[in-house]
């Protein structure tokens, strides 16, 4: 993007992001965004739900009458709030995502650097691409829905404990958690098929990255009109170990005995007992769930794969 492609961009941020000096970070990001936005507004989101309210104001032209792109600086939870704001207000505007939190799984899908300064510079060469959105009951998400161990993981992270599915080794309490997972009964309907059983973890994925690691399934795409349900069979902690380590070249076929994979457009999930649900790192819902894919629902700035190769990760 060498010209001023957009008239008015709005950059949302929280003061409590993963960036140590948020104001310096905002300066770095704004330096890049103003190269392709004629006008850039920087908007603080003070409370949960503020971004959804701002999106409705933008939709109603009460914020400004010329906003034509929205940027978000934050982690997956903040991105999730923006996606809900876009979808619930039916705001047909493209978005740009700049990493600034503990996890930025979808940033990897966009081929962007995990550092906010570099990622904002890469947006200058990015192009808009359509992505599917997941609708979960009355909420929306870009990346995944998880039950079981993945919820335990999110709660551990929120409490300041070690991340089970992140980059750290499987040692200490992590091993104990994997070896002694809590199991639950499930009944899942995917399109015209019904499956039931008992498991320690269940994931419905749209994007290919969860907890910083790639799901080792080569044709998993966030814009193919399908969602992918993964049921982790009982006593499959070694499979959990493998899946959530960074092994991009892993042969998925070797693990099919430990994981059941069900692609679908519509999914219903019932559990006994009722289970908490992790949606892109946010634990706000409980089962039962009705999930469907909304194809090509949102346009997001994406760095072409060729330009993402060999990008430095330094500030």
UniProtKB/Swiss-Prot annotation:
Q: What is its EC number?
A: 2.7.1.-
Q: What does this protein do?
A: May catalyze the ATP-dependent phosphorylation of lipids other than diacylglycerol (DAG).
Q: Keyword set for this entry?
A: ATP-binding, Kinase, Lipid biosynthesis, Lipid metabolism, Magnesium, Metal-binding, Nucleotide-binding, Phospholipid biosynthesis, Phospholipid metabolism, Transferase
A GO CC annotation given for this chain: plasma membrane
Segment forming the signal sequence = none
A biological-process GO annotation? phospholipid biosynthetic process
Organism classification: Bacteria, Bacillati, Bacillota, Bacilli, Bacillales
- Cofactor note text: Binds 1 Mg(2+) ion per subunit. This ion appears to have a structural role and is required for catalytic activity.
Q: Does the keyword Translocase apply?
A: no
> What is the protein named?
Putative lipid kinase SSP1993
Q: Which domain of life is it from?
A: Bacteria
Q: What class of enzyme is it?
A: transferase
Q: Which residues bind Mg(2+)?
A: 221, 224, 226
- SUPFAM superfamilies, alphabetically? NAD kinase/diacylglycerol kinase-like (SSF111331)
What does the record give as the active site?
282 (proton acceptor)
- Record: residues binding ATP: 45, 75-81, 102
Q: Which Pfam families match?
A: DAGK_cat (PF00781), YegS_C (PF19279)
Cite the DAGKc domain residue spans from the record: 1-140
Q: Which PROSITE patterns match?
A: DAGK
Could you state a single Gene Ontology molecular function term?
ATP binding
Family per record: Belongs to the diacylglycerol/lipid kinase family.
Q: Which cofactor does it need?
A: Mg(2+)
* Organism name: Staphylococcus saprophyticus subsp. saprophyticus (strain ATCC 15305 / DSM 20229 / NCIMB 8711 / NCTC 7292 / S-41)
